[in-house]
Amino acid sequence: MSGNGTGRRGRAVVFDYGNVLYAWEPHGALAGRRPARVWEEFVTEGGFPRWNEMADAGVPFGDILAALGRAHPDRPDWAELLADYWRHFPDTLTGPIPGVGAVVDDLLDAGVRLYALTNFNHELFAAFGRPRVPRLERFSGIVVSGRERLTKPDPAVFRVLLERHGLRGADALFVDDAPANIAAAASLGMDTHLFRGAGRLRADLTDRGLLDAPVD
């Protein structure tokens, strides 16, 4: 892979949002409002991951609450808990991932095209997610699962990104913190980086010729 500007302009890096660009801590919505054990019970026994995935897939909030009520008619408090989670959703977004903003800036300055592919409810993303990362306005494209009604690791949502923006899998590096999503991207021929911090990401991007090595 070329490390010069021409080679870089032929490449693209695709970023996940949650816990790659910006920290997402779901318990933050209810911290200080409900006991921790109440939240933990909802996650493990009330099926929070399932309901959250439905929201990420663009299912209307009212429909999700109705489905939760049907699944657990003896626990109306869980529906109230989920409604509170959405009401206080901004408190789940706890800050930029250290060092990643500088990596993004350096990639943009190097002429690398950047994209985002995120599992995120489209309404919550527009209201709270996107405004917290102003650098997204310099990205060449953003695919939000809720708008597409497809979620990672379904390969179909990766195809949406590639086809919509005229990308070849071989020309794109996908950065995500979830191994299942990394595997899905790799199955489509994309290069991948399992995110474990900005330092490792920068080193990998440098090895790939997308960033210059630091000057001693």
Annotate each language-model stretch with its function.
Residues M1-V13, L117, N121-H122, A126-D216:
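Asp-based, Mg2+/Mn2+-dependent phosphohydrolase catalytic module
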Residues S2-F48:
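Active-site neighborhood of HAD-like aspartate-dependent phosphohydrolases
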Residues D16-N19, G58, L107, A116, ...:
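Generic structural signal for small/hydrophobic residues in well-ordered secondary structure
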Residues E25-P26, G99, G197:
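Acidic donor-diphosphate engagement hotspot in glycosyltransferases and nucleotidyltransferases
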Residues A29-L30, L65-G69, Y85-P90, L124-G129:
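Hydrophobic alpha-helical core bundles mediating ligand binding, dimerization, or RNAP-core interactions
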Residues P35-G47, P73-Y85, L210-D216:
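Short, surface-exposed acidic
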Residues N52-Y85:
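A metal-dependent, Asp-based hydrolase signature
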Residues E80, D84-Y115, P155:
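Short, acidic loop-to-helix structural element flanking the phosphoryl-transfer center
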